Amino acid sequence: MATAASNPYLPGNSLLAAGSIVHSDAAGAGGGGGGGGGGGGGAGGGGGGMQPGSAAVTSGAYRGDPSSVKMVQSDFMQGAMAASNGGHMLSHAHQWVTALPHAAAAAAAAAAAAVEASSPWSGSAVGMAGSPQQPPRPPPPPPQGPDVKGGVGREDLHAGTALHHRGPPHLGPPPPPPHQGHPGGWGAAAAAAAAAAAAAAAAHLPSMAGGQQPPPQSLLYSQPGGFTVNGMLSAPPGPGGGGGGAGGGAQSLVHPGLVRGDTPELAEHHHHHHHHAHPHPPHPHHAQGPPHHGGGGAGPGLNSHDPHSDEDTPTSDDLEQFAKQFKQRRIKLGFTQADVGLALGTLYGNVFSQTTICRFEALQLSFKNMCKLKPLLNKWLEEADSSTGSPTSIDKIAAQGRKRKKRTSIEVSVKGALESHFLKCPKPSAQEITNLADSLQLEKEVVRVWFCNRRQKEKRMTPPGIQQQTPDDVYSQVGTVSADTPPPHHGLQTSVQ
């Protein structure tokens, strides 16, 4: 056995079958190399006391399938270096190992064969955790009843798993495992449990440790890239179930029950799904939170659809049509945009500026603000229509505001007379404006405003940088034109061109 321990590349070595990287001593190796029938002795030896640096229990599943035992040299060399330094790949969180044999020694010996044949984790989970730094302890007294799952071993198992998990940390509660085929034939373990209650109690801890996790993921820590069982063995195909269970187990590298404390309800959930022998697609409610019995996995998807109460929300076409009608009606009634804003503030308590009303008519407000302003303006229109012909509150409000004056329209003949007078005198005096207004039968203010607007128009038509010349200046310069001075009208033509 010393030769086998010194040469770890032998395919029949029990160390590879157990997934351990620590050389075992004579006692541990002798207990683990007994084959399928002798696996019970190995399990009993592991339960009786942990030898320093020993792989206490070996798994017949890996030993019986040489094709699945593949070495990853880099990972094995790391494990060998750790073993030569007196340590273990599992570092400092190996204290839980001695608490694993929480079941009775006799019960473990009675159920070891069934457990080893049914679950590849039954031996390898203990063998991988063997530490040369852990002193041997005497086996604890046998517990009463099937309380193994709630003992110290479970708590230590949680601590060891959380410390050795090398994958990305789980943020929040991890998702429960999906339904899938269970390798190793859990039916055999269930039959053994039905035959002997002690065997069921002893086999319950490995089953809970394995849970729904298939063999590709180690219980202690996981390797990315498909490395399994301390990163040394490839994924063995599930006996009877093909590779279906191994393929579906890549969703969660650590059993969720080992990260958070399991409840008896969750334990019942695991036992309930042990009866399935074929892979199932993951249920939708499993991805939303901890599993609950009685169909309690209904997530927010069922309640996320809230009926939208947008019956009164107008569309963009409705807003555009209303804005157009509102502008036409407002102009017809003779109200300014400022009058509308003032009326809205007085009647409904919401004061709007003239700019806001202008932007509403031009469809330059946001859709939300347009929807808010539309009902107020609609009420104002109804009030204005009902008050036509009778002095009501809206008329009084409009009277307080700035009432729009009717646009002055000047006939073509009158406009021609004003143009001819503008060419003669673009800036007439007050007396000239009064005489012109009387002759044209216009108001004095209308004539004055027309001349002001005409001068502004002339200023806009003249390009900047060119000295503006009035018609009077042109006429006055005609008699003083010299040979070297071009005519003023010629200069104006060139400037326009």
Swiss-Prot record:
DNA-binding stretch(es), residue numbering of this chain: 403-462
MF terms in GO: DNA binding; DNA-binding transcription factor activity; DNA-binding transcription factor activity, RNA polymerase II-specific; HMG box domain binding; protein homodimerization activity; RNA polymerase II cis-regulatory region sequence-specific DNA binding; sequence-specific DNA binding
One Gene Ontology cellular component: nucleus
Tissues where the protein occurs: Brain.
Compositionally biased region (Basic residues): 269-286
One of the protein's GO biological processes: metanephric loop of Henle development
Keyword Nucleotide-binding annotated: no
Principal localisation: nucleus
One protein family per Pfam: Homeodomain
Listed PROSITE patterns: HOMEOBOX_1 (PS00027), HOMEOBOX_2 (PS50071), POU_1 (PS00035), POU_2 (PS00465), POU_3 (PS51179)
SMART domains (alphabetical): HOX, POU
Region feature (Disordered): 31-62, 121-189, 230-316, 458-497
Keywords: Developmental protein, DNA-binding, Homeobox, Neurogenesis, Nucleus, Transcription, Transcription regulation
Positions of the POU-specific domain: 311-385
Transferase recorded as keyword: no
Biased composition (Polar residues): 465-483
Regions of compositional bias (Pro residues) in chain numbering: 133-145, 170-180
Compartments where found: Nucleus
Residue stretches of biased makeup (Gly residues): 31-51, 240-250
Quaternary data: Homodimer.
Role noted for this protein: Transcription factor that acts synergistically with SOX11 and SOX4. Plays a role in neuronal development. Is implicated in an enhancer activity at the embryonic met-mesencephalic junction; the enhancer element contains the octamer motif (5'-ATTTGCAT-3').
UniProt family annotation: Belongs to the POU transcription factor family. Class-3 subfamily.
Name the UniProt record assigns to this protein: POU domain, class 3, transcription factor 3
